[in-house]
Amino acid sequence: MEPEAGPVLYQKLRVWEPSLESEEEEEEISEQLILDASGPHDSSGNKAGRLPGAWAQLVAALLLLAIGFSLAVRQLCSSGASPGALGSGAPPASGHSHRPGVYHHGAIISPAAECSRLGRELFVAGGNIVDAGVGAALCLAVVHPHTTGLGATYWGLFHNSSSGNSTALTSGPAQTLAPGLGLPSALPALHMLHTHFGRLPWPHLLVGPISLAQKGFLVDTSLASALAAQDTKGLCPLLCHANGTPLGPGTQVTNTKLAAVLHKASLAPTPDLSGDALLSLLAEDLGLEGPSVGPRPTLEPALQLPLPQGILFTTPSPSAGPELLELLEASLQSAGPSPAPCPALPQAAAAPRSSVLATVDSSGSVLLLTSSLNSSFGSGHLSPSTGVLLSNLVAESAAGAWACPLIFRDISDDTEVDVLGLVASGTPAAARVMTHALLSHLARPQTPDQQGPTESPRACAQGTLLQVAAHTEHAHVSSVPSGCCPFQGF
């Protein structure tokens, strides 16, 4: 009787010898080995004494297989770590490691982890620093409505490493949409910047922000803290619970109206048309015929200050760039081996809340962006048709008094640092930190591995400073205070 389960047949291989040529001898070579834990079967004519040797060979083969698999896993773990983990310097495929914030190709740093991640994804998709920066800025417009948004005013500074030129993005003169409400210019400004310097298609940059607004995002600590300190009456129901209390950390928020505006903007072929979708809906909300003149952002050559060590670039008036250049020039001409801590800046009438981000690649191209709604949550009243908070920045004198991004291009032979970028949140105190950091760098030039903005901002009061640099074909990002702003790279 045949067994219920068929036996497993193996061929025992013998070294071929000329004397073994007959069919009968070849048939005798074939032996039947049955793998059965109950013991060996002798139905094939095998001698029981031969089975232990076969089992030993099988065990040895399995052991070798296990060892080989283990070695392969260890090799993958040591060389295949994913680069660009949030806030990490994961070792690249080349096998050497870096400190956190140092990457081979490009990096981005922003106030929101979700937006830094989105910027990195645009890098990986083949985009450049402008694609990553603009995409992250649109993301911040969704997840950080307390500091920025589609109603915000934007300033930017872009340095092209290939040409050596730096270009300033200006918001144009402050305009009023309605009493106490600033004319929104974010969409045409960002679209203009991308049209001239971006690489990926414009709609690609809005896919992530649209998804966040449509499917929802989580309230982070920064937004939750701002909500806790704010009268939320004009922010409900978007940022409130059903009982009117502000949302806390980890609460999911969806803004479908904003998603619809972003979708329309993604289809606009020109910067001017990208802002029209928002303006037409805002006019309906406010009962207006529409603004007589649209926003007028511009791209123009950055201001320059030649120095013995290199060239300093910043944004033109009405930003705070010219005043900062005057301050830096006066500080460098004054006697003394080192810069004075926290040099005083010209006093501004107000210190509006703002948002900053920075991107850099290993070739030395840098993009710095800063934006503001003037106050926390701007006007404090949510547009029901658009899900947008408008700015209350309407005084032309204050249109850019808070904006002062700086880029230093090194042309000396004494240091390997190619480009250094600094951008601070919109307070005079933070700008003093930025000025002091630049003066310290000029007085004692060091590599980014040796130097970083690790000074506590408490030395010059509160503020946020982002620093990016390109050095020895690597991109470097860091912040003051350390850890305040998530970064990613690849």
Curated annotation (Swiss-Prot):
Catalytic activity: an N-terminal (5-L-glutamyl)-[peptide] + an alpha-amino acid = 5-L-glutamyl amino acid + an N-terminal L-alpha-aminoacyl-[peptide]; glutathione + H2O = L-cysteinylglycine + L-glutamate; an S-substituted glutathione + H2O = an S-substituted L-cysteinylglycine + L-glutamate
Membrane topology designation: Single-pass type II membrane protein
GO BP annotations, alphabetical order: glutathione biosynthetic process
Gene this protein is translated from: GGT6
Cell location: Membrane
Presence of the UniProt keyword Glycoprotein in the record: yes
Protein modification: Cleaved by autocatalysis into a large and a small subunit and the autocatalytic cleavage is essential to the functional activation of the enzyme.
Topological domain spans for side Extracellular: 74-490
Assembly, per entry: Heterodimer composed of the light and heavy chains. The active site is located in the light chain.
Name used for this protein in its record: Glutathione hydrolase 6
Family stated for the protein in its record: Belongs to the gamma-glutamyltransferase family.
InterPro entries: Gamma-glutamyltransfase, GGT_ssub, Ntn_hydrolases_N
Sorted UniProt keywords: Acyltransferase, Glutathione biosynthesis, Glycoprotein, Hydrolase, Membrane, Signal-anchor, Transferase, Transmembrane, Transmembrane helix, Zymogen
Source organism (scientific name): Bos taurus (Bovine)
